[in-house]
Amino acid sequence: MDEFDLFTSHPACIRVVEKDIKQASALKAKGNEYYKQKFFDTAIKYYTRAISYCPLTKEHSYSRAVFYSNRAACYMSMTEYDRAIEDCSTALSFEPTYVKTILRRCKAYEAIDQLEDAVADIDRIVDIDKGNRTFLMEQHRLQTKLKEKQEAMKKEMMDKLKGLGNTILGKFGMSLDNFKFNQKDDGTYSVNFQQ
């Protein structure tokens, strides 16, 4: 039985944890060992305990951010992206410019196809570390992927609207082929009727 299970095996068990950064750091180190061995569930338990032992003072904000970020790395490895995003966001509330965590959350957003959020995170990273070529290339890749997704969604919507329009206009002996759509420079469309 895992040492953690002794404390949590009974639902009425309440455990008071005294805040201790040395204990928190030791638990994090143990979590790191399990993470390297790919025992993610066990690593999560250690990181969670590290979080509970970490003092809530401002001087320990970075440590808290690291503990949450490390736990998020476990969730990423387990493809539990929503939980990874949640832990990354918590870590960033303690350390807003922690690039490693922003990048981890960016990857999680991309994994669940929330490309707008992924692009926002990579833009934030580039703002923090402007000269990093790797981040600039990643920014370009994600922006391109987002534009492709938006274009595909726009095409799908236009096809659906065209189908609906043809259904309605068909009752009057017309189709959308009688209408010419022209896109203006500002992104809007004008419609011209042709017989």
Task: Give each language-model segment a name.
Residues 1-195:
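Alpha-helical tetratricopeptide repeat
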